[in-house]
């Protein structure tokens, strides 16, 4: 995995992402940390985790995340709900592709340390959102859209919407 940090973020946010990277590298020793301005150093077949709303690679790789996200003006749409990036932090995993792609966006620099601590406990989910206080407001599996166990009889692909369930334990 390559954790790609945003070079265009404000200084305080860049420092918070550097702390995030250090924490995760202690937990995951094989994690490579790279700056989004040094994309030539990233192999074409690399698994990527993009950090920060201002990450330069979001423009290039973000298309794969569009299967689970949408936009409503400036807000992100996840599971039919709107989340603004000024008061919500999100973590997303692309539901398909030969190589893994993830994105972590923080509401602000102060939210990043708690994401470093919390996200490893939510690794089975493909979509997460946290409010400004750090409380989890969405945890959902990413839809499976490209599986050998799936066959589409038409060109149009539709996603199955499962009913919302309340967790047995919070």
Language model: regions and residue ranges:
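Solvent-exposed alpha-helical segments and adjacent loops
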Residues: 1-170
């Amino acid at each position: 995995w390559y954790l790609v940090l945003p070079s265009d973020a404000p200084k305080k946010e860049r420092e918070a992402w550097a702390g995030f990277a250090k924490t995760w590298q202690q937990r995951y020793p094989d994690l490579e940390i790279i700056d989004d301005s040094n994309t030539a150093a990233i192999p074409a077949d690399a698994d990527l985790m993009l950090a920060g709303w201002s990450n330069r690679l979001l423009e290039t790789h973000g298309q794969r995340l569009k299967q689970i996200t949408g936009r409503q003006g400036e807000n992100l749409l996840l599971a039919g709900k709107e989340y603004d990036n000024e008061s919500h932090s999100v973590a997303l995993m692309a539901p398909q592709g030969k190589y893994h792609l993830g994105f972590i966006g923080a509401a602000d620099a102060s939210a990043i340390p708690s994401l470093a601590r919390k996200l490893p406990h939510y690794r089975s989910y493909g979509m997460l959102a946290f409010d400004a206080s750090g409380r989890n407001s969405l945890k959902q599996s990413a839809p499976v859209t490209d599986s050998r166990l799936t066959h589409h009889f038409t060109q149009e692909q539709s996603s199955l919407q499962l009913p919302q369930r309340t967790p047995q334990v919070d």
